[in-house]
């Protein structure tokens, strides 16, 4: 990195860390029902909503009621979005007269946005109307983010409460999360993004003439959209001359803010945050990365404050930061070393393919690692154009169950599942009954934590294996060999871990990938969520056990190091064979 890039990266983390404590404290006050600066504004709104919906805010739920409420809430929103996509052609705010989605694509997209994945088998500006973007996708960006956050809060309550059967009230937690956290921050973020040049309008798309006409050859397609080939098997092409271009418009800033803040990631445009109307300047780029990490980072301090020991939260944050910074370093090194095949031609330099020059390599490295360490999935660089090792970094961060900050809420509760595993294994090694925050870790907690950690990994390997042996899966691959495997592995890793980014060389808009992806996203989201709630419910019922000489201190550096090793070892044991056949093999082939 040059001095400017070092300064940019260091300053970013300094500002982020400076806001972790005050923002984490604010979120703790919100979920504990304490007074905040926004209480005079939102308490009347909150109480009005409870009266309208018939919610008793003092009626706390056990883990089963909490889980059922969460599942019902998400089911209603999934069905509503599915219907909206099927009816898009007759709904308002559709100046381009875009048609309805096909049912497989509508199903995949509805589940994608409900689960906070935002996997997109369509191009936003070419397929989704303004009504769909605002009342469908943007609304789900709020609801899916709130769902993840409140599950994490319920998990914290399970750890800190004693001899209790209650984890809180899902409806109250979701209302407070949306009113006090997501809406105010999204408003501020949207205003800032508009100041940087992100568009916000309802104008029809603009058609403008080009200064110079452009001609090129493109493959001819049959009625089914399949490329036509001649007798020798070569693609049949036709000459096309372009004299004008269509520039898409839309209410982008309002959606861009919650897209990053809620670690959703679904782009208004197909190019996502590489598009200048979504992410126009280096400052907007840094700001969007900041939004991606803010809530997930702040929740670690929220956890420590609610647990009565803020060092517990700092320990988890240290683990997240250590792995994230390591990932940034490996990514930067791989991309700055360039492409070995290009270097053999005598052309040396960094790999800038698929990257935006206005962000540079440092801005691309920071964004790519942040968006895959969390469940965001937004991209400002094309991950399919990365070097094999550079591409393996975001893929590996996703495969680690996205605990490196992770999605809003999901990152923290998955990290807590890893903590339970680490405490249990350490207890076995020293011959002591494992304890965490004064609660004994027993068989139920281990089953639930293992389910939380391994569910997505099992889905990734099963669906990737199926895709590689079925013609329906292989036919969507535009690349063969090691890179083709990496594309399929990345796709199901992204969907199963609710990330949403992709190696774009894979055609996902097929019946096979729409349906298998929908199943992967559903199970990857809700199996760990219910398992965490079950674990929290069991822990809440337990009595407090005072620390003794044999208690493992979990708020100190040795445990943070042990937790880091457990995360990396679990990830390596699960996915190293697949990575060896994918990006590692591709890198070795390129270096021959």
UniProtKB/Swiss-Prot annotation:
Membrane-traversing stretches: 6-26, 67-87, 136-156, 179-199, 283-303, 312-332, 359-379, 389-409, 411-431, 450-470, 489-511, 519-539, 559-579
GO CC term (a single one): plasma membrane
Protein keywords: Cell inner membrane, Cell membrane, Ion transport, Membrane, Potassium, Potassium transport, Transmembrane, Transmembrane helix, Transport
Membrane topology per record: Multi-pass membrane protein
Record PANTHER family: POTASSIUM-TRANSPORTING ATPASE A CHAIN, POTASSIUM-TRANSPORTING ATPASE POTASSIUM-BINDING SUBUNIT
Assembly description: The system is composed of three essential subunits: KdpA, KdpB and KdpC.
Its job: Part of the high-affinity ATP-driven potassium transport (or Kdp) system, which catalyzes the hydrolysis of ATP coupled with the electrogenic transport of potassium into the cytoplasm. This subunit binds the periplasmic potassium ions and delivers the ions to the membrane domain of KdpB through an intramembrane tunnel.
NCBIfam families, sorted: kdpA (TIGR00680)
Entry protein name: Potassium-transporting ATPase potassium-binding subunit
Gene: kdpA
């Amino acid at each position: 990195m040059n001095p400017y890039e070092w300064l940019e990266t260091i300053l970013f983390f300094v500002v982020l860390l400076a806001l972790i404590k005050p923002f984490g404290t604010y979120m703790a006050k919100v979920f504990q029902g304490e007074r905040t600066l926004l209480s005079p504004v939102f308490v009347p709104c909150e109480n009005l909503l409870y009266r309208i919906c018939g919610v008793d805010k003092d009626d706390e739920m056990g883990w089963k009621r909490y889980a059922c409420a969460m599942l019902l809430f998400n089911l209603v929103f999934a069905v509503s979005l599915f219907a909206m996509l099927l009816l898009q052609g007759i709904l308002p705010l559709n100046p381009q007269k875009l048609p309805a989605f096909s049912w497989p694509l509508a199903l995949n997209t509805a589940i994608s946005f409900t689960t906070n994945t935002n996997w997109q088998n369509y191009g936003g500006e070419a397929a989704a109307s303004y009504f769909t973007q605002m009342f469908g996708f943007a609304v789900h960006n709020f609801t899916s983010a709130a769902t993840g956050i409140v599950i994490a809060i319920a998990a914290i309550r399970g750890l800190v409460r004693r001899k209790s059967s209650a984890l809180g009230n899902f409806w109250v937690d979701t209302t407070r999360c949306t009113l006090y956290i997501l809406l105010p921050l999204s408003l501020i973020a949207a205003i800032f993004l508009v100041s940087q040049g992100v568009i916000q309008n309802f104008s029809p798309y603009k058609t403008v003439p080009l200064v110079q006409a452009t001609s090129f050859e493109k493959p001819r397609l049959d009625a089914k959209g399949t490329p036509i080939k001649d007798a020798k098997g070569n693609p049949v092409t036709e000459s096309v001359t372009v004299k004008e271009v269509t520039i898409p418009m839309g209410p982008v800033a309002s959606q861009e803010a919650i897209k990053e803040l809620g670690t959703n990631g679904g782009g208004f445009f197909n190019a996502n945050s590489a598009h200048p109307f979504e992410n126009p300047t280096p400052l907007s780029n840094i700001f969007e990365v900041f939004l991606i990490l803010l809530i997930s980072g702040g929740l670690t301090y929220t956890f420590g404050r609610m647990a009565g020991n803020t060092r517990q939260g700092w320990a988890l944050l240290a683990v997240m930061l250590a792995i994230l910074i390591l990932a940034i370093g490996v990514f930067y090194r791989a991309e700055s070393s360039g492409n070995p095949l290009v270097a053999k031609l005598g052309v040396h330099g960094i790999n800038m393919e698929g990257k935006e020059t206005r962000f540079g390599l440092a801005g691309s490295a920071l964004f790519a690692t942040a968006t895959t360490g969390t469940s965001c999935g937004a991209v400002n660089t094309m991950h399919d154009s990365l070097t094999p090792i550079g591409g393996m970094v975001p893929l590996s961060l996703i495969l680690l169950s996205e605990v490196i900050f992770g999605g809003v809420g999901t990152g923290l509760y998955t990290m807590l599942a890893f903590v339970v595993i680490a405490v249990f294994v350490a207890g076995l090694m020293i011959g002591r009954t494992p304890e965490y925050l004064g609660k004994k870790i027993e068989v139920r907690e281990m089953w639930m934590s293992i389910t939380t950690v391994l569910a997505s990994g099992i889905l990734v390997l099963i669906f990737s294996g199926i895709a590689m042996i079925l013609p329906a899966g292989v036919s969507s691959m535009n690349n063969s060999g090691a890179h083709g495997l990496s594309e399929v592995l990345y796709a199901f890793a992204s969907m199963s871990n609710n990330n949403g980014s992709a190696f774009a060389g894979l055609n996902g808009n097929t019946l096979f990938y729409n349906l298998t992806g929908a199943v992967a996203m559903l199970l990857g989201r809700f199996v760990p969520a219910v398992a965490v709630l079950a674990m929290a419910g069991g822990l809440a019922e337990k009595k407090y056990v005072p620390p003794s000489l044999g208690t493992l201190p979990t708020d100190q550096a040795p445990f943070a190091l042990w937790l880091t090793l457990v995360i990396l070892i679990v990830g390596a044991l699960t996915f190293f064979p697949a990575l060896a056949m994918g990006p590692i093999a591709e890198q070795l082939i390129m270096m021959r």
